[in-house]
Design a protein with these regions (language model features):
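N-terminal segment of the mature soluble domain
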Residues: 12-92, 251-261
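Generic structural hydrophobic/aromatic packing signal, biased to beta-strands
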Residues: 41-43, 82, 127, 225, ...
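Generic marker of residues within folded, mature protein domains
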Residues: 1-3, 33, 72, 117
């Protein structure tokens, strides 16, 4: 609201103004309201028997972050339980890419064919959130088998090498694909829970107009009110306490309330 007052001066009376650019940092409030005393969370991950050996080196629970909350190993105010499904190949095929060379006249003088393997695969993951009393809070789908994904192998000049690539390197490729899928799922979950329940750090860039003419009768008072705003508001960060801020801003608020009646 304070930022509207300088604009009111401009709209109703010709005034020399300076554009003052600033950045402010703050924490956004949760979109979904739950018990305001809840401030800790823990994460549990369960995989299938097929995927468990590959998940051991990934520690997906460490990737889940709820901004503004404290993470515990167990017994948090809310518990996030994640179920990771299998990474399943659904189709394998060999594709080719043909490269032609031409002479100066544009006549094709040669061709070279490169072969690569494409593997269509799917992945599924879900999360369920409850509080420590056992009350259900929300479910979230993190990955769906409806979304087909495609892995493309390196290219080879010999077709047989492309045809056997996934079979020979299935463990390495599957682990890398699973890692990518898990990372995306945990990132999606972190974004969703931070939006819904977190206190996210936000940086906003904006500007306001301040009186530039020393001849203006409000110059000194306006600048003083602006200095108060600058010291209190623009110096705050997401971890700052707002205790006492309203009292410190009261002189500036009173001033702007007064001048909007005059201009």
């Amino acid at each position: 609201m304070l930022l509207l007052f300088p604009l009111a001066l401009t709209a109703q009376k010709s005034v020399d103004l300076d554009k003052y650019r600033f950045s402010v940092q703050y924490r956004s409030l949760p979109k979904i309201r739950i018990d305001s005393t809840y401030r800790t969370y823990n994460v549990e991950v369960e995989g299938t028997k097929l995927m468990e050996p590959l998940l051991k080196d990934m520690s997906p629970e460490k990737l889940v972050m709820l901004e503004g909350w404290r993470k515990l190993a167990e017994d948090g105010h809310i518990s996030i339980k994640i179920n990771l499904g299998d990474l399943l190949p659904e189709g394998v095929s060999v594709k080719e890419r043909v490269v032609t060379t031409k002479n100066r006249d544009g006549v094709i003088t040669g061709t070279k064919t490169y072969y690569y393997q494409e593997v269509v695969y799917t992945f599924s993951a879900n999360a369920s959130i409850t509080d420590y009393k056992g009350m259900h809070i929300m479910d979230e789908e993190l990955a769906s088998r409806v979304n087909k994904q495609v892995y493309r192998s390196p290219e080879f000049t010999i077709r047989a090498l492309a045809e056997g690539y996934f079979v020979v390197n299935s463990l390495t490729v599957t682990k890398q694909l699973l890692q990518n899928c898990v990372n995306r799922a945990m990132h999606h979950l972190s974004e969703r829970i931070s939006d819904n329940f977190g206190f996210r750090e936000v940086t906003a860039n904006d500007y306001m107009w301040i009186i530039d003419s020393r001849k203006h009768p409000e110059y000194a008072a306006y600048r003083q009110a602006f200095r108060v705003m600058n010291e209190v508001l623009f110096s705050m960060n997401p971890s700052s306490s707002i205790e006492g801020a309203k009292e410190q801003l009261k002189p500036a608020i009173d001033y702007f309330e007064k001048i909007k009646k005059n201009y």
